Amino acid sequence: FDNEGHLFVTMGDRSSAQFRDRAQDLDSHIGTIVRINPDGSIPDDNPFVGQGDALPEIWAYGVRNVQAAALHPETGALWEIEHGPRGGDELNIIEPGANYGWPVVTFGVEYSGGTIGEGISSAPGMIDPIYQWTPVIAPSGMTFYAGDIFEEWQGNLFVGGLASTALVRLELDGNR
């Protein structure tokens, strides 16, 4: 829940080549992050409210397989991490109405080694991740440090890694 009480829900692409292209379609929940009120209604200020060809609950789209999300303790911005395929795990700051590119752009490749999408990692109109891991760490959770014991870690982001069996600390400089 954000500071205004809205609930964010992430919807992946089911890790399926059959469904992945739907992450670019605003009439599908696949590959999206939705924002709703606690009673299930749609906030009036969601970016696609009133756009006839889009589901109004969609907050952002073009994500692959979100594994964790957290609100930045100072800015309230929604951050998320997602599994890439073979390479290209991502850390993103989610903006309303933004397209994060999956599967058109990715730093990863098919598990078979083939190209995904257009074989590019950036494109106009699509938001680049603020950080990506290749090889993958298979992120499994994240939190911003707000404790008192390690003052120099204040605001740092901690990410668990399944494949790396590691806890990764990212020292942030603003949104980087």
Question: Which residues does each PLM region occupy?
Answer:
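Beta-propeller domain segments
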Residues: 4, 13-176
